Amino acid sequence: MVKRTHGYRYKSRKLLSKKPRERGVPGLSRLLYEYKPGDKVVIDVDPTFVSTAPHRRYQGKVGVVIGTRGRAYVIETYIGDKKKIIVTTPEHLKPFQGGS
């Protein structure tokens, strides 16, 4: 028997697929939204843009913008007690709408 491989997008069929009405490129308001350092954002992976997508474990996580790197944003978030730094483009970010 051969061991099955577990790639980068392993177990993400439902998570990284769009419903028929959501297919295609998202609106310009989402793509051109500018975040400032200190803004809270939600990581919402858009499967249309594969090369800049963060790992699926960060889907739905809330983070803080700590800077930019070219066109991308540097996001600080936590997985348990560990601080993680994510570098991703605005296609995969939404402004955080919750409380403080």
From Swiss-Prot:
Disulfide bonds: none
InterPro entries linked to this entry: Ribosomal_eL21 (IPR001147), Ribosomal_eL21_arc (IPR022856), Ribosomal_eL21_CS (IPR018259), Ribosomal_eL21_sf (IPR036948), Translation_prot_SH3-like_sf (IPR008991)
UniProt keyword Cell inner membrane, yes or no: no
Record bears the keyword Ribosomal protein: yes
GO BP: translation
One Pfam family hit: Ribosomal_L21e
A single GO cellular-component term on record: ribonucleoprotein complex
Name this polypeptide is given: Large ribosomal subunit protein eL21
Taxonomic placement: Archaea, Thermoproteota, Thermoprotei, Thermoproteales, Thermoproteaceae
